[in-house]
Every structure is written in structure tokens, then in C-alpha cells.
């Protein structure tokens, strides 16, 4: 794990946030409390600022970056699926879900409880309205919206990652060290 300053900018990491040993967090990065940063994730605050709210999960091999002098902003309880790339987004609002392998590009705006499907590409400046689902390349917003049942299910899934952030510091024991 690399948690490092870059040109005088040091990551700020909230209480109870877990960063996997193979993840990298450096530069102007703020992580809220209770976040889970998975294996291979790269959160790069070398060009611009990265701000994640509380209880976010950044799954395996994600990349989060910002343009020089700009900020990538991510709300609370956001799930970023395995292998997703988040680049210089204007805002990913609370409870949003970014599917595995999705790309969310510059100045995109993802609404509260919005879902970006697996492998989707959200283009520069594109807006995904709250509680809507976007899929495809390029991402298209579906008429179908997120149901209360779906929200309840994802609330449980999101809590699983908050629980992992508490369990990993003691539970993760590399072979030969336990």
C-alpha cells in the first residue's frame, strides 16, 4: 500500500477507512470515514483534488483521477464497482452505483441513487438523473427508474463494505505472517 504526499499535498483519511495493502492513495485526496478501498485501487491526487464522502466502497482495480487544478467529487455511500475508471467527474451524488468496468468521464454528473451499468461509458459532461439507470457505450438513460426494493437491497450491500472496512485491519493476514 502506498499512501503518499505529492508536491506537499498529503491524503486525509477519515476514521475507520480501510485501504488495502495493494492500493495506492496519493496527493490531494480526502477520504471520508468508514470507506473501503479495495485491492489494486489507485486514487491519484497528483494533478487535481479527489474528495470521497463517508462510507464509500472503491472496489478492486478502480482508478480515480482529476484534471490539473480541478476536483473529482464523490458523495456518501457511493459504490464504485471493480475496474471502474472515474476521471474528473463534476459529482457522483450520494448512494450512486457505478458498475464494474464502467467509465465515468470528465465533468459528468451522476444523480443520487443513479446506477451506471457494468461496462457503460458516461461521456464528458453527460448527466445521469437521480434514481435513473444508464447502460451502454455511450451510456443511454433508461426510462426505468430505481425501485424502493432495489434501494433496500443495495443499502444492505453497501453496509457489507462498511463492515469490511472494520473487519479487514485484523482479518487480513498474508500467508506466512499469521
What are these regions (language model features)?
Residues 1-37:
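N-terminal segments that cap or nucleate solenoid repeat domains
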Residues 1-12, 46-54, 60-62, 67, ...:
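Glycine-rich hexapeptide-repeat left-handed beta-helix
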Residues 31-55:
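Generic amphipathic, hydrophobic interface segment in small proteins and small subunits
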